[in-house]
Every structure is written in structure tokens, then in C-alpha cells.
């Protein structure tokens, strides 16, 4: 699977981590917090994108 991911600066990454921690402090699960922040980043990011390939480990088993 290929996915276009935002290319973030270190500062942007730090802000994303802080946002995830804020959401978790409000009682949201870590997975849900990560998903929400990822969705926010994809919706608002205007910089470069990187392409990542994710392999399904269960494939061919």
C-alpha cells in the first residue's frame, strides 16, 4: 500500500505530539488521538508530501 504523507519539520512534529498528548489528557485513546491529529495534518498541510510504502505482513501467509 502506498500513502502520501505530509513532510513535517521537527517543530511541526513536536506540535503534533503535543496535540496528541492534549487529546489523550482529555480521555481519548492514543490510537484515536493519533488518527485525529493525522486527519488534521492531512487537511491543513500545504507543504511537500512524501510517498511511503506499507507492506501487509499478513500477505501470503
From Swiss-Prot:
Tell me which family the UniProt entry assigns to this protein: Belongs to the UPF0181 family.
**Would you tell me the protein name for this molecule?**
UPF0181 protein KPN78578_22920
Amino acid at each position: 500500500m502506498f500513502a502520501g504523507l505530509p513532510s513535517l519539520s521537527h517543530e511541526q512534529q513536536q506540535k503534533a505530539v503535543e496535540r496528541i498528548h492534549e487529546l489523550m489528557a482529555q480521555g481519548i485513546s492514543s490510537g484515536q488521538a493519533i488518527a485525529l491529529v493525522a486527519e488534521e495534518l492531512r487537511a491543513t498541510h500545504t507543504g511537500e508530501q512524501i510517498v511511503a510504502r506499507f507492506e501487509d505482513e499478513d500477505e501470503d501467509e
